[in-house]
Amino acid sequence: MGIKFLEVIKPFCAVLPEIQKPERKIQFREKVLWTAITLFIFLVCCQIPLFGIMSSDSADPFYWMRVILASNRGTLMELGISPIVTSGLIMQLLAGAKIIGVGDTPKDRALFNGAQKLFGMIITIGQAIVYVMTGMYGDPSEMGAGICLLIIIQLFVAGLIVLLLDELLQKGYGLGSGISLFIATNICETIVWKAFSPTTVNTGRGTEFEGAIIALFHLLATRTDKVRALREGFYRQNLPNLMNLIATVFVFAVVIYFQGFRVDLPIKSARYRGQYNTYPIKLFYTSNIPIILQSALVSNLYVISQMLSTRFSGNFLVNLLGTWSDATSGGPARAYPVAGLCYYLSPPESFGSVLDDPVHAGIYIVFMLGSCAFFSKTWIEVSGSSAKDVAKQLKEQQMVMRGHRETSMVHELNRYIPTAAAFGGLCIGGLSVMADFLGAIGSGTGILLAVTIIYQYFEIFVKEQSEVGSMGALLF
């Protein structure tokens, strides 16, 4: 059934826009250039407003997810990477549940990737329609069918651009992946902005600067009670404070520390005697994939809940899924869940919120740990990184594990890889929860994604450096 499904969509995959694989080895300088161009296009799209929208000042239901999904409200990047990640989530779940089968052949892998792209385009259209019809840009009946269609087309084209930019990097023209690059850029931009933003916000305490560091100096300069000003700079509510910055730096350090945890399996050449090496199995074996998929799951649940809440407010089942409220203090207008399933799957705002509602905190912890472990373990089966796949790669390189026969390699690798994947996903979820409870800027999930992505790029640079010889040779 699985292979038949991939064969059915094969004609559709053939007409999809595609980036061709490079016919030659791309030099590092070219990769840096293409990566910079990709990032520039993304940042430009983040600043171009959608043409035809009547208003985008209403409460933002996806405010808490925008940092993670690399989206910017009211612009071409309204959807961000959500369609790509959602299609990946759907395909992974279908493959993990054996509803569709993905073979080990390059043909099946290519069809699987094509199906993922096709679903990404379909989801882009679906999300664009939902955004327009739920009134995020104004009343659809007042805007008219033509303007609504124009906004949907803009969102679809922007989503297609994101798909192709991601594919451009993944095909080897650039460094890393587009998804990772866009997420890391968005999160780092948010952290810097929350620290140094010169924007003023009118609070009950008077006019204050949004940036935590600028606000501290402003408070010390304008308040007569310096001790109180210092305390307010560290602990002020509803706006970024220095404790949030300290928590962010602390989480960065902890995640970097855990990045170094790994088990080195001794391997040797089956052809040449005396040639030994190691195969590293990292604690974060699936890197940030679990948290990205978990974010996609929650964001789509938010979309569905918001859509139903707008249309069928007061319905018991709709309220069971999520009840929403608007908040305008301490920043832009935003909607947040106050009851229902969406509330319990959203992170507590601070450690004080954990003490106020321990049931919420407990359910959130269980959900984060369980979903990250599940996604991590199922991802290895569809991404070519399971014990069977690793054993096949080692066999192709004519390498075997020391002290084990070639036929027993899969069994031995199965002792480590699934455990590392599940436990690594569990740790990823745990670190994200810790960051949320400490109040880190950009959310626990965002900080975790930023650190793991930056670390991935550091490893890419080190690898390229070892291949070329020196960083100077890489860049000049």
Curated annotation (Swiss-Prot):
Q: Which residues lie on this side of the membrane: Lumenal?
A: 54-76, 139-144, 194-240, 310-354, 442-445
Q: Does the keyword Nucleotide-binding apply?
A: no
* Gene behind this protein: sec61a
- Cytoplasmic compartment: which residues? 2-33, 97-117, 166-172, 262-288, 376-420, 463-476
Against PANTHER family, the record matches this protein to: SECY/SEC61-ALPHA FAMILY MEMBER
Principal location:
endoplasmic reticulum
Any single biological process term in GO: protein targeting to ER
Which family would the database say this protein is a member of?
Belongs to the SecY/SEC61-alpha family.
What's its job? Answer: Component of SEC61 channel-forming translocon complex that mediates transport of signal peptide-containing precursor polypeptides across the endoplasmic reticulum (ER). Forms a ribosome receptor and a gated pore in the ER membrane, both functions required for cotranslational translocation of nascent polypeptides. May cooperate with auxiliary protein SEC62, SEC63 and HSPA5/BiP to enable post-translational transport of small presecretory proteins.
The entry's protein name is: Protein transport protein Sec61 subunit alpha
Keywords per UniProt: Developmental protein, Endoplasmic reticulum, Membrane, Protein transport, Translocation, Transmembrane, Transmembrane helix, Transport
Cite the record's note on assembly: The SEC61 channel-forming translocon complex consists of channel-forming core components SEC61A1, SEC61B and SEC61G and different auxiliary components such as SEC62 and SEC63. The SEC61 channel associates with the multi-pass translocon (MPT) complex.
What domain of life is recorded for the organism?
Answer: Eukaryota
Q: How does it sit in the membrane?
A: Multi-pass membrane protein
Q: Which GO terms describe its cellular component?
A: endoplasmic reticulum membrane
Location(s), subcellular? Endoplasmic reticulum membrane
Which residues span the membrane?
A: 34-53, 77-96, 118-138, 145-165, 173-193, 241-261, 289-309, 355-375, 421-441, 446-462
PROSITE patterns on file: SECY_1 (PS00755), SECY_2 (PS00756)
